[in-house]
Amino acid sequence: MVRPPLTPEERLRGEQLGVMLRQARGARSIVEVATAAGMSAETLRKIETGRIATPAFFTIAALADVLDVSLDHLAVRAVPATPAMPT
Amino acid sequence: MVRPPLTPEERLRGEQLGVMLRQARGARSIVEVATAAGMSAETLRKIETGRIATPAFFTIAALADVLDVSLDHLAVRAVPATPAMPT
DNA sequence: TATAGGCCGAATAAAAATACCGGTATAGTT
DNA sequence: AACTATACCGGTATTTTTATTCGGCCTATA
């Protein structure tokens, strides 16, 4: 009936996404990239550190545009192992 | 100091994303696609109708995977005109 | 009848996104 | 040495939004 809490797997997934975004930022400062992507530096920092585990689609899209990385690439890399549910 | 309300532009952007996802779903039922993507049917319906304007990145990623569409494609199409800020 | 698909509104807990504060560490300047 | 500026981190507080379930309602079709 309510929104369920994030699972440990979802937390991990968010951390991995953050690591990739941080790596893509390279030597640029958080302030510069966040401003270019139209978000606050605090938000970008929390995404990079995984404290925002399930950020909004358009937030990541804006970041990917600024950082010149592919959204599909990010999604695939962040969700590595599909549970492979048996039929 | 607080999270600002969604702008009309963000609402529109969400609606456009919904339209694209709906089109990609084709003849498949909401229940089938939502289940395959690991979310409730109600949530998918709200995304398609734009009532969830800024869905989570991994939510859209799961949908894009099931529907076999590109996240980059969705992002570009949903945010068509960059404001073209003058230098 | 009844079954399947879809639409809508209310209610709820959890989380996003933001700002502010202090702390740390490094690099450059006076 | 003292000061200044930049950059990053962690916590707190706040409002808005997500994601979910439930119930009802409608339409087509077997």
Give each language-model segment a name.
Chain A
Residues 49-51, 79:
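Residue-level detection of the helix-turn-helix DNA-binding "recognition helix"
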Residues 4, 75-87:
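Short, charged recognition helix plus adjacent turn
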Residues 58-73:
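DNA major-groove recognition helix of helix-turn-helix/homeodomain DNA-binding modules
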Residues 22, 31-32, 61:
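Residues within the helices of the helix-turn-helix
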Residues 27-29, 55-58:
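Residue-level signal for the short linker/turn that defines the boundary of a DNA-recognition helix
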Residues 26-46:
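Short alpha-helical DNA-recognition segment
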Residues 1-27, 72:
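A short, Lys/Arg-rich alpha-helix, primarily the initiator
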